[in-house]
């Protein structure tokens, strides 16, 4: 079966990529090198992960070793929400590009639909704890990002954490030059996202699933939170296929033609997470996994939930 999705630009995006959120700078370099050695060609990055410099070092070392060519890699990064002012977009992008030590990106995403006040704080708040928004919106940021495509610095643009109303606003923007090719969203058995995935795919927008394993290592996890990796029925499906739970959770997305970016810094797991193209989940398996949906999010940025353009109040 295909190991990539074809984007609306005709570029091929590998279905499984390495996620780097929560990978500490000390570990992420070795993780990226192990991933490239294991056959990964898609690396998902972001300014806000504070580790793009090390990711870039790993990519450069592998290119120098002739382990991989730049044109065979698919490198993604994201514009953080404090850089929506047009004058700031290019600076933020150049920071990312120089940290990654590349001369172009394959895909550049708007990381979050709300614009936050520019400055050093990633989530700026007033003294009452209220999140401070920017006067600039994702539509302003998009115009500046389109210039990066026109200049040959980025091959394609996308979005992340957008609901379908926000996507409609972008698609209907007067003078839109470059359509979003992908929407990167949280998805796993407790957040199956069927309606949003169907909507995106119907518009020619590929979907990438982040936190496919339920983000068990998120720093703010509460003891009562559900644990995706511990669902007995999914353990049963994994045993039946002689696969790990993680492999089943990754395969679940691959079979929906959804790109998936599991994060790991452990070489054996990094390898294992790519070994999902040699088995098939049955219709019953897929239906069983989908049945666990409860619209539970590991990543909800609740601090911003009372502000305009918060994406998760809508059904999809």
Swiss-Prot record:
Under InterPro entries, the record lists: AKR (IPR020471), Aldo/ket_reductase_CS (IPR018170), NADP_OxRdtase_dom (IPR023210), NADP_OxRdtase_dom_sf (IPR036812)
| Positions that bind NADP(+) | 20-21, 44, 160-161, 184, 210-215, 263-269, 273
Keyword Cell wall biogenesis/degradation in the entry? The reply is no
Origin superkingdom: Eukaryota
Q: Name the reaction it catalyses.
A: an alditol + NADP(+) = an aldose + NADPH + H(+); prostaglandin F2alpha + NADP(+) = prostaglandin H2 + NADPH + H(+)
Binding-site residues for substrate, renumbered to this chain = 111
Its biological purpose: Reduces a broad range of aliphatic and aromatic aldehydes to the corresponding alcohols. Reduces prostaglandins. May play a role in the metabolism of xenobiotic aromatic aldehydes.
Q: What is this protein called?
A: Aldo-keto reductase family 1 member B7
Q: Origin organism of this chain?
A: Mus musculus
Q: What is the lineage of its organism?
A: Eukaryota, Metazoa, Chordata, Craniata, Vertebrata
């Amino acid at each position: 079966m295909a190991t990539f999705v074809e984007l609306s630009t005709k570029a091929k995006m590998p279905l499984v990529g390495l996620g780097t959120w929560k990978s500490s700078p000390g570990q992420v370099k070795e993780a990226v090198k192990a991933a490239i050695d294991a056959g990964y060609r898609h690396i998902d990055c972001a300014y806000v992960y504070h580790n793009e410099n090390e990711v870039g070092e790993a990519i450069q070392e592998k290119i120098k070793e002739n382990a991989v060519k730049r044109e065979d890699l698919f490198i993604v990064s994201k514009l953080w929400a404090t850089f929506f002012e047009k004058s700031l977009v290019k600076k933020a992008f150049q920071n990312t590009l120089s940290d990654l030590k590349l001369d172009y990106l394959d895909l550049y995403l708007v990381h979050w639909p709300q614009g936050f006040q520019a400055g050093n704080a990633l989530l700026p708040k007033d003294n009452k704890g209220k999140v401070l928004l920017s006067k600039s919106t994702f539509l302003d940021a998009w115009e500046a990002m389109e210039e990066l495509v026109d200049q040959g610095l980025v091959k394609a643009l996308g979005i992340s954490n957008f609901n379908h109303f926000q996507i409609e606003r972008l698609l209907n923007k007067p003078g839109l030059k470059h359509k979003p090719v992908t929407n990167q969203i949280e998805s796993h058995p407790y957040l199956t996202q069927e309606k949003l995935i169907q909507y995106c795919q119907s518009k020619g927008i590929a979907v990438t699933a982040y936190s496919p394993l339920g983000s068990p290592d998120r720093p703010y996890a509460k003891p009562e939170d559900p644990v995706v990796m511990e669902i007995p029925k999914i353990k049963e499906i994994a045993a039946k296929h002689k696969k790990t739970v993680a492999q089943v959770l990754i395969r679940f997305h691959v079979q929906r033609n959804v790109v998936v970016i599991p994060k790991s810094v452990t070489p054996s797991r990094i390898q294992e997470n790519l070994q999902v193209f040699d088995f098939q989940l049955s219709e019953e398996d897929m239906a069983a996994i989908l049945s666990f949906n409860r619209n539970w999010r590991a990543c909800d940025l609740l601090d911003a939930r009372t502000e305009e353009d918060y994406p998760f109040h809508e059904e999809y």
